């Protein structure tokens, strides 16, 4: 059985949604970040990065959301979720998830994790103040150019969709005006209508 570690409000929700989508048999363990459980020896032995998600498989441990999403889809024979039928579609899915991981998630992290980049209290506050602007900018590209609708790549649901949904759930707290993002909000509603999303949310949030 697969075992996944997650935390409320974290990006790990995306992986749990996908596990529900493919009807995987898995065990969910929630970490309490407010108590620093991600830094304790028991979890450090699983993932020395001290972050979630982490997925324990029969072959070993996987970390990082793009890798875990890809593994789940391939493990359960859901090739359509990764665009395996077409090398270009496959690459576009990787491109989209790479943008979420390397750009959008990092912009969000400046609000809560500024100490990763600086120890200067004034600089940390400056990073926080910049978040509404920077998150609006990076998410605007998705709204205007990348989101095809009804799913991220058009008619076919892919591993990008739970990933984008999870990040979009942070936008209001990041100070982004979501009324100016009709496509993204329609995507959110489409995701909320899926039983897998509701099943994951009921366990984590």
Language-model-detected regions and their locations in the chain:
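GST-like fold's C-terminal all-alpha helical module
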Residues: 100-193
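GST-like domain detector, emphasizing the conserved glutathione-binding G-site
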Residues: 1-126
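Residue-level recognition of oxygen-bearing side chains
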Residues: 67, 183, 196
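Structured helix-beta-strand junction loops
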Residues: 49, 75, 148-149, 194
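Exported/periplasmic ABC-transporter solute-binding proteins
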Residues: 199, 203-204
């Amino acid at each position: 059985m697969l075992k996944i570690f997650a935390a409320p409000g974290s990006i790990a929700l995306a992986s749990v949604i996908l596990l529900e989508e493919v009807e995987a048999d898995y065990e969910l363990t929630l970490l309490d970040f407010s108590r620093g459980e991600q830094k304790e020896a028991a979890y450090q032995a699983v993932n020395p990065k001290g972050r979630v998600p982490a997925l324990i498989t029969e072959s070993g441990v996987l970390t990082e959301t793009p890798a875990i999403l890809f593994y789940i889809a391939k493990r359960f024979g859901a090739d359509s979720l990764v665009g395996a039928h077409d090398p270009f579609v496959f690459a576009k899915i990787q491109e989209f998830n790479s943008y979420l991981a390397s750009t959008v998630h990092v912009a969000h992290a400046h609000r809560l994790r500024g100490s990763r980049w600086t120890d200067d209290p004034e600089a940390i506050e400056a990073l926080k103040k910049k978040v509404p602007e920077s998150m609006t900018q990076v998410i605007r590209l998705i709204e205007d150019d990348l989101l095809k609708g009804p799913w991220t790549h058009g008619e076919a649901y892919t591993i990008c969709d739970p990933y984008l949904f999870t990040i979009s759930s942070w936008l209001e707290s990041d100070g982004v005006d979501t009324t100016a993002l009709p496509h993204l909000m329609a995507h959110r509603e489409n995701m909320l209508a899926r039983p897998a999303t509701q099943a994951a949310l009921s366990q984590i949030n």
